[in-house]
Amino acid sequence: MMYHIPGVLSPQDVARFREQLEQAEWVDGRVTTGAQGAQVKNNQQVDTRSALYAALQNEVLNAVNQHALFFAAALPRTLSTPLFNRYQNNETYGFHVDGAVRSHPQNGWMRTDLSATLFLSDPESYDGGELVVNDTFGQHRVKLPAGDLVLYPSSSLHCVTPVTRGVRVASFMWIQSMIRDDKKRAMLFELDNNIQSLKSHYGESEEILSLLNLYHNLLREWSEI
């Protein structure tokens, strides 16, 4: 399943990020890609050795960790270090699949269950640059407001179409979920959403408590910690 997570960054945060990224040192995006991806990748990424990068990636991690909807949808166990990319002048990233595992500075290795893109450019400021994701439900074309995030299974083939006008800037990362199976994770997310909706309409009740108990027992049964 694909999820739109709005308002991960405020407009003020986005503006500050963009101002700082204007001062960043950008390098060839293929430095973080395997042999297959390098054949179809043509973009730029912020140099991960810079002090600015270290500060910005920490801010992204803090923002997603504090976002309740992101947590409910992803049920994250491990987050990769966020990266930042830029597309302009017809740069693109052809169809590819993300690697199943990635190195992690604290945990050694992590499994990539989910991929996330946090948009940092207003969609009206550039042409092209759509994230195209192919999954079992068909093809999805994504171009979200700045500050919003899209979350989708890392097993999906996906690409970024050529940016023919303006500049597309984003942050991206991978998540190892406590729930490995996409279908089980989606069921838990739907159950959680319905519990929250019922609580907002009717307040606390024995029935809602029973559903909450069911949610946590399923999470206990399925989670890998």
From Swiss-Prot:
Cofactor(s) required, per the database record: Fe(2+); L-ascorbate
Keyword set includes Oxidoreductase: yes
Gene Ontology annotations of biological process type: DNA damage response; intracellular iron ion homeostasis
Binding site for 2-oxoglutarate: R168
Keywords: Dioxygenase, Iron, Metal-binding, Oxidoreductase, Vitamin C
Residues annotated for Fe cation binding in this entry: H96, D98, H158
Assigned EC number: 1.14.11.-
Stored PROSITE patterns: FE2OG_OXY
One MF term in the entry's GO annotations: 2-oxoglutarate-dependent dioxygenase activity
Cofactor, how bound (note): Binds 1 Fe(2+) ion per subunit.
Keyword Glycoprotein: no
Domain Fe2OG dioxygenase: 78-177
SUPFAM superfamilies from the UniProt entry: Clavaminate synthase-like
Pfam families found in the cross-reference section: 2OG-FeII_Oxy_3 (PF13640), PKHD_C (PF18331)
Domain of life of the source: Bacteria
Listed PANTHER family: PKHD-TYPE HYDROXYLASE YBIX (PTHR41536:SF1)
UniProt name for this protein: PKHD-type hydroxylase YbiX
Gene from which this protein is expressed: ybiX
